[in-house]
Structure formats: structure tokens, C-alpha cells
């Protein structure tokens, strides 16, 4: 996902090419990110023999079993000693699986203590001590399996058990002498690096710490900030977008479409009294107003002879009649326009130019509103954007609010510098790469991401394991 951490110090580690297990940090109380692995291409290769094979070095990462830190193991060890002293008779009577489980825990604590002692030794250790360190980790890994008689024997005798090692990269001094990485190790993880080959590998990166933003008073104190990110397309939001993006041409076009509609509705409500006022200014009585209404009805159903009679009446009235005819036609058009706003478009010539503008607007929008599921991610489009859709490889600028299922906000970007990333390149959690694809500039949608497309079983600070994440996102720019 978006980065939930910030760098605080430089991380650097030298891993010699002797196959030794090098702890990633002196203790497991620091969180760090490895961003580069490199070798010195001018360094002379160190071959084990006089072989003429190609010089290269392979970096591997080894992780101790999770959930076995030193304090917990020591506490378990002390608790087991107390329980043995207090209930020695019970153990003699109630033998069975419980005894094996206690023995396994004691053995795990002993192996972990052996591992910590080996880690605290000087770097200039001999090969035998190196082998003991590897054997201690091997026993610790094996201790996580269910305890059996065979396991007890193997744990004591099979010190050469191979650990599960993951290859990170292979470097050579000719072409690939450095490799960008993005490996984050959480606080409390016990991680080791190992290099085999002809060159020492140098790891660099940063010590990092989670970004801790206060969220307890979010609902009470951040109401105004919440208005900066509202899914309803109101004028405040359009203004915010203009300030952030520096582009207001499209928003002005929309405002030009909507304001005349509002004006016509208001004038429609006020035009009825004006008809009477205009007649009053020209000193027409109530009888004349009634006669005018009858004339309007006669116009819709009269034959050719009645039209000629009406023309004669207008000629007899002189200029006053001509002046009055124009306001009547104008008022009729305005009433007709207001009616169209409520009941839909009309084929009249006066309305046709206005009908093209909403059509053009519909052609610019991208996608469809509604809920759909894409590769396990539930997407609910609240507002469609305009222009081309975001595709893999595009750099996108986003606003977002991230929540858990219980409504707790764990992260957000509602103002200031937008969050940017390259879509489809693994710079964010997989659910974001899926959920943001297809959005257009100005689009808003809600993305519901299952845990296996977010942070999985482990989670991160502020997000428990197996958490489903809900994001309200808005696309500001596609680069």
C-alpha cells in the first residue's frame, strides 16, 4: 500500500562471501527497509579453489520462526521451572502429551538462548562457532513442529539440518553489480543474511518507523477536514480540486451548464406576478386581463378567420398592442423552458442547443456507476471521471481515506501533497493496483480489499492480521 512508514536513519550491512549467517540487526528491536544490494566490481574475487568459473555472489535471506522472542521464551522457561517445583507429583501421575509439550517449550527456550549467545559473539569467530549458530537456528525451526520421539532424537543429533533459505539476488562484477530491493523487516523479526560466492555484498537502506497519526478524536475534530473529501460533487470539492491541480477549465464548463438552469427555474416562479404588473403599468383593468386570457385560448383552437380578426384588433390598438405582444411571447418561452427542466427535453428549436451540452458531458465520462467485483476487489464507483482511464504503468495522484470494517480510520490523504505511485508495478498493495485501474481524472470510488490482497495474516502496525480494508479514493491526475 501506500507507505505507512517514514525513514529515520541509514541502514547498512556488510555480508562477507563466506557462507556465514549475519544478523540483519544486532537485536530484533528495530524496523528497517533494504533498498539496494551491491558488490564492488573492482574487488578481487575470492575463489575457494583455483577454479576458472565465472565470479559471482548470491545473497540469501533466512528468517527465524515468528512468535518466539527472547522475553516470551525466558518467561516460559521460568514458568516451567515453577510449575515443575509446584506440581512434581502431578507430572509423575499424569504423564502423556502434556509432558511432551512442556519439554518442547523448554527445549525451544534453550535453543533460543543458544542462538542469542551466538549472535552476541565477536564477528571474528571460527568455523566451528559459525556451524553452531546455524545448528541453533535449525533446532529452533524444528522445535516449532509437533513434538515426537523422532523429533527429539533428530534435535539432539542432526545439527547439520539445512535451513529454509530464500534467494534474494545474484550479482556479478561484469554486468549486474547492483540490484534495487524493497524488503521491509518488521520490529521483532529475526532475520539473517548469507552470501555465497566470490564477492562481499553490501546492503543499504533505511531504518524506518510507522507513521503514527492520532485517530481517537477523528470524528469530533476532523469534521472540517472530512468536508475536503466528500463523495458528493459539490462546489467546495470542485474548488479544492482546482487548487490542487491548477486546472479549472473543466469545472468552469460544468458551472456554465448548471447556473442557467437554476436561473430559469427562479425566473419561472417569479414571472407570473410580472404578467399582472405589466398589465397594471399600462392601466389595464380586470376585464381586459380576462379578455386577454380568452384570446390566448382562442389562439390554440381558432381557424384562419379568427386569426385575421385578432390581427385587426392589434392594428386598431396601435403601438401599445405591438409592445405588449413581445412580452407575451417572451413569457411563453420562459414558462416552456422551466417545464422542460421538470419533464424532460422538448423538440422546440430554443432547447436544442442546450441539449447538446449534457450529451457532450456524457461522452467525456469514463466507466459506469455501480458495484462490481474485479479479481476479488469490490469496486463501487460513486462518481465517474473524464478523459482516458488509468492503466498499468501510469503514475497517478490520489486522495484517499482508509478504514477498517469497524469504521476506524487507519490512514488518509485528504489535503496537501497527493499520494502518487506507478500503477500496476507493485509499489502499493495488490488490491490498490486492481482497484484504481480504470479510473479517470475526477473519478471517485470505494474499494473493498480482502486481506489476502492487502496485508494478509500478519498485518502491519495499526492494521490487524486478516483485516479487510475499505478505501474511499479519488483520482486527481494521471501522468
Swiss-Prot record:
Residues 39-106, 141-162, 205-367 are annotated as: Disordered. It catalyses: [protein]-peptidylproline (omega=180) = [protein]-peptidylproline (omega=0). Residues 393-479 form the PPIase FKBP-type domain. Inhibited by both FK506 and rapamycin. Signal peptide: none annotated. Residues 272-299, 325-334, 348-364 have a biased composition (Basic and acidic residues). This is FK506-binding protein 4. GO terms for molecular function: peptidyl-prolyl cis-trans isomerase activity. Coiled coil: none annotated. It holds the Pfam family NPL. PANTHER family: 39 KDA FK506-BINDING NUCLEAR PROTEIN, FKBP-TYPE PEPTIDYL-PROLYL CIS-TRANS ISOMERASE FKPA. Belongs to the FKBP-type PPIase family. FKBP3/4 subfamily. Binds to histones H3 and H4. GO terms for cellular component: chromatin; nucleolus. PPIase that acts as a histone chaperone. Histone proline isomerase that increases the rate of cis-trans isomerization at prolines on the histone H3 N-terminal tail. Proline isomerization influences H3 methylation thereby regulating gene expression. Residues 40-49, 68-93, 148-162, 214-256 have a biased composition (Acidic residues). It comes from the Eukaryota. Keywords: Chaperone, Isomerase, Nucleus, Rotamase. Its EC number is 5.2.1.8. The gene is fpr4. It is found in: Nucleus. InterPro entries: NPL, PPIase_dom_sf, PPIase_FKBP_dom, PPIase_Fpr3/Fpr4-like. SUPFAM superfamilies: FKBP-like. The keyword Ribonucleoprotein does not apply.
Amino acid at each position: 500500500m501506500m507507505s505507512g512508514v517514514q525513514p529515520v536513519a541509514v541502514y547498512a550491512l556488510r555480508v562477507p562471501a563466506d557462507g556465514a549467517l549475519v544478523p540483519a540487526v544486532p537485536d530484533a528491536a528495530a524496523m528497517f527497509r533494504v533498498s539496494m544490494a551491491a558488490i564492488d566490481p573492482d574487488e578481487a574475487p575470492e575463489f575457494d579453489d583455483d577454479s576458472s568459473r565465472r565470479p559471482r555472489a548470491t545473497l540469501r535471506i533466512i528468517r527465524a520462526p515468528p512468535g518466539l522472542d527472547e522475553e516470551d521464551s525466558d518467561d516460559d522457561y521460568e514458568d516451567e521451572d515453577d510449575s515443575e517445583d509446584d506440581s512434581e507429583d502431578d507430572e509423575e501421575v499424569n504423564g502423556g502429551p502434556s509432558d511432551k509439550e512442556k519439554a518442547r517449550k523448554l527445549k525451544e527456550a534453550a535453543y533460543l538462548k543458544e542462538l542469542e549467545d551466538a549472535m552476541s559473539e565477536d564477528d571474528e569467530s571460527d568455523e566451528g562457532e559459525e556451524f553452531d549458530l546455524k545448528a541453533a537456528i535449525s533446532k529452533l525451526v524444528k522445535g516449532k513442529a509437533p513434538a515426537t520421539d523422532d523429533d527429539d532424537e533428530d534435535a539432539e543429533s542432526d545439527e547439520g539440518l539445512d535451513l529454509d533459505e530464500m534467494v534474494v539476488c545474484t550479482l556479478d562484477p561484469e554486468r549486474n553489480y547492483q540490484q534495487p530491493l524493497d524488503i521491509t523487516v518488521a520490529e521483532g523479526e529475526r532475520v539473517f543474511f548469507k552470501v555465497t560466492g566470490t564477492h562481499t555484498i553490501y546492503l543499504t537502506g533505511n531504518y524506518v518507523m510507522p507513521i503514527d497519526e492520532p485517530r481517537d478524536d477523528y470524528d469530533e475534530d476532523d469534521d472540517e477536514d472530512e468536508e475536503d473529501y466528500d463523495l458528493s460533487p459539490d462546489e467546495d470539492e470542485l474548488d479544492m480540486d482546482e487548487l490542487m491541480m491548477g486546472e479549472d477549465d473543466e469545472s468552469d464548463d460544468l458551472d456554465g451548464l448548471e447556473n442557467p438552469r437554476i436561473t430559469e427555474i427562479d425566473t419561472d416562479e417569479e414571472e407570473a406576478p410580472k404578467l399582472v404588473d405589466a398589465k397594471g403599468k399600462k392601466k389595464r383593468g380586470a376585464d381586459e386581463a380576462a379578455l386577454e386570457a380568452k384570446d390566448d385560448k382562442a389562439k390554440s383552437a381558432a381557424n384562419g378567420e379568427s386569426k385575421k380578426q385578432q390581427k385587426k384588433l392589434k392594428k386598431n390598438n396601435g403601438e401599445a398592442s405591438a409592445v405588449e405582444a413581445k412580452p407575451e411571447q417572451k413569457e411563453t418561452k420562459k414558462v416552456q423552458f422551466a417545464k422542460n427542466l421538470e419533464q424532460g427535453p422538448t423538440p422546440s428549436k430554443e432547447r436544442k442547443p442546450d441539449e447538446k451540452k449534457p450529451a457532450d458531458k456524457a461522452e467525456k465520462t469514463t466507466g459506469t456507476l455501480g458495484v462490481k467485483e474485479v479479481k476479488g476487489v469490490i469496486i463501487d464507483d460513486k462518481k465517474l471521471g473524464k478523459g482516458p482511464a488509468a492503466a498499468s504503468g501510469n503514475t497517478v495522484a490520489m486522495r484517499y481515506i482508509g478504514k477498517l470494517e469497524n469504521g476506524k480510520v487507519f490512514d488518509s490523504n485528504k489535503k496537501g501533497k497527493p499520494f502518487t505511485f506507478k500503477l500496476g508495478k507493485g509499489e502499493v498493495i495488490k488490491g490498490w493496483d486492481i482497484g484504481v485501474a480504470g479510473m479517470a481524472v475526477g473519478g471517485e470510488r470505494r474499494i473493498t480489499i480482502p486481506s489476502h490482497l492487502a496485508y494478509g495474516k500478519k498485518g502491519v502496525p495499526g492494521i490487524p492480521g486478516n483485516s479487510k480494508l475499505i478505501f474511499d479514493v479519488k483520482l486527481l491526475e494521471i501522468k
